[in-house]
A protein has these predicted regions:
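Active-site nucleotide/adenylate-binding loops and adjacent lid/helix of ATP-dependent enzymes
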Residues: 2-9, 13-14, 21, 98-103, ...
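ATP-dependent carboxylate activation and anion-phosphoryl transfer catalytic cores
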Residues: 3, 8-12, 279-353
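Residue-level detector of anion-binding/catalytic polar loops
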Residues: 36, 132, 160, 221, ...
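A glycine- and small-aliphatic-rich helix-loop capping segment at beta-alpha/alpha-beta transitions
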Residues: 124-133, 204, 209, 336-337
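Phosphate-binding site of ATP-dependent enzymes
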Residues: 203-287, 308-314
């Protein structure tokens, strides 16, 4: 009997639309001979099965439903499209009812970028109800999603990182002292944002306070990091049984100030994979990726981002639910490794505990 997979996308962050694209791309590559795939759009308390019949999902349905929910429409109006319309997930049993029959999910494939899919909340739910899933644990996801906590954890592994200052909303801070410690320019970031949303590059001390307060409009804490000028590189890694598979390294080249949302998703960057770097540097980056993966206790697919300056590798951040759109970094690394997307996705599923 085929196992039933809940492929979950959407979420409550600015990345919900990208999450849908990632999830749809994953869905297209799951082997239907082995699995029944149900796509689940999550937005707040609304968890809606897009294809309760198990048939293919209309291409624009998830995005239309997301936009309707974001506009304040009740989920019931989204679900009122007749036969084959979305239905609610029963969160107590992680199941749904279709034509009088209860369908219970066997496992979850989380493709939500940001909250609640990348910060441990959704993982905690699945751990409580005993449903296996594809990402890092709730504990590891919570640590890696918070840039400050992640850096404090990883620094004990002997990995180099940019110097930083952490500020929580309501705390006092002195811009001159911060710049005196970190120099200029600096990057001002929310500690728990994704896809470079809310990041500002500050070049003058008098602009620092405005950048910090801009973050505080949406987030409770901020991390200010020194700028390290170098080559931006990223590396994916995933578990296949007892083996850790390290994907080729990608170099990111952009004419923008940094690799922000526009550079990532609107084509304003060039991703070179495999990166045109010495084999020795590639090996050191992959070794660092494996070192962090093991030290953090990661599982599933993870992507690590770095800056390399004069041969020194500086860790930037860990992505525990990396983008999986056709133009995302990991799928490009998979192609460069000579692995088909279908083989890759089904390997990830087979390794769900």
């Amino acid at each position: 009997m085929k196992k039933k997979i809940a492929l979950i996308y959407g979420g409550n962050s600015e990345e919900a639309g990208i999450s849908i694209q990632s999830g749809r791309n994953v869905s297209r590559n799951i082997c239907r001979e082995k699995y029944d795939v149900y796509e689940v759009l999550l937005k707040g308390v609304d968890w809606l099965v897009m294809n309760p019949s198990g048939d293919a999902v209309q291409d624009d349905l998830p995005q239309r439903c997301l936009e309707a929910l974001c506009a304040g429409e009740a989920a019931e109006s989204v679900m009122a499209a007749g036969a084959g319309a979305p239905v609610r997930v029963d969160k107590c049993t992680f199941s749904f009812v279709h034509q009088g029959e209860t369908v219970k999910f066997d496992m979850a494939f989380i493709m939500i970028h940001g909250t609640p899919g990348e910060n441990g909340l959704l993982q905690g739910y699945f751990e409580m109800i005993g449903v296996p899933y594809n990402t890092c644990s709730a504990y590891v996801s919570a640590i890696t999603f918070d840039k400050h906590s992640c850096k404090r954890f990883i620094e004990h592994a002997g990995v180099k990182m940019a110097k930083d200052v952490f500020i929580r909303r309501g705390s006092s801070y002195n811009p001159e002292e911060i710049i005196g410690e970190l120099g200029l320019p600096v990057f001002v970031k929310p500690t728990n944002g994704g896809s470079s949303f809310g990041i500002t590059k500050v070049k003058r001390v008098e602009d620092l306070e405005a950048a910090v307060e801009l973050v505080f409009k949406e987030y409770d804490s901020v991390i200010i990091e020194e700028s390290i000028v170098g080559r931006e590189l990223t590396n994916g890694i995933y578990a296949n049984g007892s083996e850790l598979v390290k994907l080729p390294v990608t170099e990111i080249v952009t004419t923008r100030e940094f690799f922000d949302y526009e550079a990532k998703y609107l084509g304003e960057s060039q991703e070179i994979c495999p990166a045109h770097i010495p084999d020795e540097l590639t090996a050191r980056i992959q070794q660092t990726t494996e070192k962090i993966y093991r030290y953090m206790g990661c599982s599933g697919l993870v992507r690590m981002d770095y800056i390399v300056r004069d041969g020194e590798i500086f860790f930037l951040e860990t992505n525990t639910v990396p983008g999986m759109t056709p133009m995302s970094l990991v799928p490009a690394q998979v192609r460069a490794a000579g692995i088909s997307m279908e083989e890759f996705v089904n390997t990830l599923i087979e390794n769900i505990c």
